[in-house]
């Protein structure tokens, strides 16, 4: 019985990056032997155990044979005779197929993952790559993390990803897994690499058609020197990752704020009048399909519908600013204002030549919200107002607070 550290922990250590969870593989053991040593079985689809002291996951070395469509269509063999090399062969990328002996610290790298780490190449291990459509998503997500380090996808790996897209294999991806990989990509330093990887290998159309439809749609160069809406979307996603690092909530709202531009009739290009309203329907469809959590949906819809209003904040009347805050449910969910401000800043700075531009609207929105929020309904009730009178007086007082706050900054 031999134990090896495998996967991301080994990869990240060799890259000099902070490692997350550690995964272990056990060669030469079966379930009875693992349980006899105090390991607790937890795996449903294949034999995984929790260490009795550390709680870390230990999996028996195994092989996988394709038996059906999709990422669940596999027959697993975890016989004690399965070798370390056979276990590493089933893994997705060479940089994830490196093992380190727990006792000696010796590395085992039968598929030249260390060489690819040094060359900054994401390469599949073997032809079985095409059997699991999740690997297309993982390739894109790894690029969102590794592209800032100079990684590229091996041409032969990109070719296999195109074959998988053409075969329809990506249609078998379950929504929860698509959302999981998308959400993780949005926490990475360069989410645009997730989009670009899928787009360049023909997978984005099957996985995120609402985003794919933005590529090739022109915008007015006066406001968008990058012109292509798809390129703008990539820039916005990267800017969101820069100003709100690790915040997938802000990242998702930034990613989806301009979906309505794909629905603009071509004869109206490059203008996109009312795109902020048209974008709500495809956004809601995307959220339904991927089973996106409610907090993500709600912020994304607000950002889609209101981002132009925030950009035009200095032009809005005081009453209109209050109406904007009400539509955002900002008096019950005050955190949304800071989140919306970040999304709108990412939109404004996610344009060619505007990357370092100031965005005073964000701070002003938060300041006006704070002024309006200082008005308390309980104080009005204490003055003897009742029922609808309180609501009317509260609105009037909050608008007055916005007016006063604007005068102090004038």
From Swiss-Prot:
Alphabetized UniProt keyword annotations: ATP-binding, Hydrolase, Magnesium, Metal-binding, Multifunctional enzyme, Nickel, Nucleotide-binding, Nucleotidyltransferase, RNA repair, RNA-binding, Transferase, tRNA processing
Q: Is Metal-binding among the key words of this record?
A: yes
Q: Where is the HD domain?
A: 229-347
The UniProt entry, under CDD domains, shows: NT_ClassII-CCAase
Binding-site positions, ATP: 8, 11, 91, 138, 141
Give the highest taxon in the source lineage. Bacteria
Q: Which InterPro entries match?
A: CCA_bact, HD_domain, NT_sf, PolA_pol_head_dom, PolyA_RNA-bd, tRNA_CCA-adding_enzyme
One GO molecular function term of this record is: cyclic-nucleotide phosphodiesterase activity
Q: For this protein, what does the record note about how its cofactor is bound?
A: Magnesium is required for nucleotidyltransferase activity. Nickel for phosphatase activity.
* Binding locations of Mg(2+): 21, 23
One further remark on this entry is: A single active site specifically recognizes both ATP and CTP and is responsible for their addition.
Q: What is known of its domains?
A: Comprises two domains: an N-terminal domain containing the nucleotidyltransferase activity and a C-terminal HD domain associated with both phosphodiesterase and phosphatase activities.
Name the family the entry cites. Belongs to the tRNA nucleotidyltransferase/poly(A) polymerase family. Bacterial CCA-adding enzyme type 1 subfamily.
This chain belongs to which protein, by name? Answer: Multifunctional CCA protein
